[in-house]
Each structure stands twice: as structure tokens, then as C-alpha cells.
């Protein structure tokens, strides 16, 4: 199973993406800032990161 990290400060965006990705069979991790994202990346084997750069 592929794992995806969704990182965005907008919780609604993260929730919506998580719903769609999980429905397609992906394991989804959440982060709401860069520090949280780095912690997830240290602890999990992540295949793809989706993030808002703005």
C-alpha cells in the first residue's frame, strides 16, 4: 500500500484530500505545518507528499 502525507494549514483541505485518497486505497498521514510534516517523515515510510507551498 502506498502512503501519502498531506500537509496544509487548512484543516478542511487536509480532510477532503484524506477522504478521496483513502477511498482509493491509500494510507494517508496528516500534518498542519512543516514541523509536523518532518516528524511524520522521520517516523513513516512516505511515498508522496502533497503540500501547500504558499
Model-derived segments and their meaning:
Residues 1-5:
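Non-catalytic signal-transmission and effector/linker regions of two-component phosphorelay proteins
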Residues 6, 50:
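Walker B beta-strand of ABC/ABC-like P-loop ATPase nucleotide-binding domains
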Residues 8, 25, 45:
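Conserved functional loop/turn residues at catalytic and ligand-binding sites
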Residues 10, 53-54:
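The short loop immediately C-terminal to the conserved phospho-acceptor aspartate in CheY-like receiver
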Residues 11-29:
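Two-component/phosphorelay signaling modules centered on CheY-like receiver
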Residues 30-48:
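Acidic, metal-coordinating helix/loop segments flanking the phosphotransfer/catalytic sites
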Amino acid at each position: 500500500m502506498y502512503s501519502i502525507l498531506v500537509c496544509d494549514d487548512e484543516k478542511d483541505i487536509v480532510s477532503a484530500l484524506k477522504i478521496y485518497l483513502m477511498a482509493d486505497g491509500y494510507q494517508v498521514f496528516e500534518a498542519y505545518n512543516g514541523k509536523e510534516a518532518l516528524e511524520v517523515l522521520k517516523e513513516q515510510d512516505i511515498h508522496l507528499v502533497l503540500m501547500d507551498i504558499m
